Amino acid sequence: MKRLCLSLLCALACLPARGEIGVTDVSGAGIRLAAPARRIVSLSPHITELLFAAGAGDRVVGTVDYSDYPPAAKLLPRVGGHSLDLEAIVALKPDLVLGWQSGNAVAAVARLRALGLTVHLSEPKRIEDVAGELERIGKLAGTEATANAAAKAFRERYAQLAARYSRRPSVAVFYQIWKQPLMTVNGKQIISDAIRLCGGRNVFAQLPILAPTVTVEAVIAANPEVIVASGMGESRPEWLDDWRRWTTLTAVARDNLYFVPPDLLQRHTPRILDGAEKLCIHLEAARGKRGK
């Protein structure tokens, strides 16, 4: 009986205290907050956007460069960009810091934790993971009603796109991030998940690096039916049309050179479904050109 009581006491000790908030992040680290976060620092543009989507935009006291959506995010104090200003972060006295596992330096995250800050890491690896991120943020910020509703709407829209496009005839796709160096994504990157959602196949899915450099010769050998470019802004990059010199490429011969605004596909946020839908429409157009 004593052994049973001791076991129960140990189990209860491992549970969050009454009112305490417990969440496990993508790294497996357990996050504990005594109360919903009121002062949050975001270390990535996509996290800033997720915070607003989860109803916690008014809790954000600092963020990084390129956090530009929604428009209110542009007004937030900056704490660095690729390199973080740790002093500025500490000065904001956050009760929660939300970081990007693959985008923030490991040493910087470790230093923030050593300084006594609570750091939760985000890394949606598949489109469906965005909904879970919204729910976790809602729990940490105490905005579950808004966050859960946003997650539900996201899952429903994702299911609709999957039902419409994922089983369509396959289309070989080359997704170009940049020109110099010539860069793409592998099969584990979330953009590849969008390609699969649309019934496409990433021709460089097998490469081991998330954002590998490739050669023009490798692209020609892969002979994609569609080339999709992102770039850095909201307008079609001039270098997308550089592919027209390679007239033997199926994508060129059929005029399947497309652009999707990078913020819609390269940020792990609810807007990724806007980008995915644009991509799906492009791939459907490419299917319509077969046999012509």
Where are these regions (language model features)?
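Short helix-initiation/N-cap motifs at beta->coil->alpha
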Residues: 24-28, 77-87, 207-216
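A short, structured surface patch at a secondary-structure boundary
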Residues: 38-92, 96-102, 203, 231
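Short helices/loops that flank or line small-molecule/ion binding pockets
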Residues: 86-93, 115, 214-223
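Bacterial N-terminal signal peptides
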Residues: 5-14
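His/Asp/Glu-enriched short active-site or ligand-binding loop at hydrolase and phosphoryl-transfer sites
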Residues: 64, 188-211, 231, 259
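N-terminal hydrophobic or amphipathic helices and topogenic motifs
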Residues: 17-39
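Extracytoplasmic substrate-binding proteins
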Residues: 20, 29-30, 96, 100, ...
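Short secondary-structure boundary segments
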Residues: 44, 101-102, 177, 207, ...
